[in-house]
Amino acid sequence: MAITPLTHLPEQDVIVVGAGFGGCAALHHLRRAGYSAKILDACDDFGGVWNMNRYPGARVDSETPTYQFSDTQVRDGFNFSENYPSSGEMRRYFAHMSAELGLRRDALFGQKVVEARYDDESRRWVLSTEKGLVARSRFVVFAAGSSNKAYIPDFKNKSAFKGPIIHPKFWPENADMTGKRVGIIGQGSSGLQIVQELAKTDCELTSKNPSGRRAT
């Protein structure tokens, strides 16, 4: 028997957009306060930026004593292996945290919100997703963060480059740079983390900073 796609979510007190740290914390505390709430997230699981970013060397730049939930049941049940965990370990942490707090039952993944409007007549928010889901709520918490969109500069003559152009957000799984000439443009956190990892491989590596400022 065919499964009918969900097109209308039962009305909630609150819809939370985003399943990273902010969204997970919002859902947990809203439910604890007695509100009905659901998370909508464009990705396939919890984690936010740590679910999206899987490039070589991706890791936290804040130490774990401060970069985690303070809830005892979450904190005491997970031991980080490093002070600055990798993105892979952060995904394992989010799996642990979401299981401990029972968040998955109120989360809908693969639901990219494309419209949020307030209906004055019903005094409700109406959210629509790319897949056609419609959700209504009294309140909305926007917790999508600021790093969910890839910035790809329109460099002059970029189309003339015949090799692959890879943004860290879309790094291919198991990509092998051995024996290749690799140029890294940008020396922020992502750029430097990738450089540190690729420097361990047998490739010709060049790092450029278009801004001319020192690495950050």
Predicted regions and their residues:
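Short polybasic/polar patches that bind polyanions
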Residues: 31, 51, 99
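A short alpha-helix-loop-beta-strand transition element characteristic
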Residues: 52, 76, 81, 102, ...
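Hydrophobic pocket-lining residues within nucleotide cofactor-binding pockets
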Residues: 46, 55, 113, 171
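Feature captures the FAD/FMN-dependent oxidoreductase FAD-binding
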Residues: 81-146
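Short Asp/Glu-rich motifs
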Residues: 49-50, 117
